[in-house]
Amino acid sequence: MKKWLIYLLSAVLILVYFFIIILPVVDSLSGHIARKEAERQVEQIQVSMEALWDTRGDELTFIADSVLLLHEQYQYPTSFHLYPGGEKSIRPTKILSKPTVLYNQLYNAITQFSQNSEIEFAQIFYANKNPFYYPQDSCVFRYIIKVDDDEYCHCDLIYSPNWEQHKQDGNICDPFGNDLSKRVADDWYVVVLYPYEYY
């Protein structure tokens, strides 16, 4: 009986060790790998965007080409969502009512392109109430990048003529006060945040 008891206790201790020590380490390592993969993908996107801007130079063409770039590189399934002012909606009338010529141009260019494209998840919104504290005079086009089965990051392409001034004034571009932006063209910036809950 004592041997069986010893075997049983040993098995219990092994299980406890596995669930308390091994699994958290494996989960942490998986998260680290997912983050590195997201960083690698985002770096590729940033480099490609810079190359697009160098060859194009036109803002609307730049937007459309960057959408095409993601489609060609990652072959995302179709889904298109619109976030005017950070408020979930898919009603174009709500967006078109915004008194911003650039915003409407971006909306028209992207929606026209999206009819024949396949994008995992895209948003465009005028940044007046969005939860990531972008300047109110900016316009944001967001890509949700799938890293693996349950890991996502988002890559925001931002048009903001006064971005540098907002940074000097102490405005932040994520909820934690971190400046994660990278300038990719005149008045265009990329901000990457991850992981991101997929909704």
Feature map (PLM): residue ranges:
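Generic detector of bulky aromatic hydrophobic side chains
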Residues: 7, 20, 24-27, 188, ...
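Alpha-helical interaction segments
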Residues: 6-8, 43, 178-179
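General helical structural elements
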Residues: 6-7, 60, 146
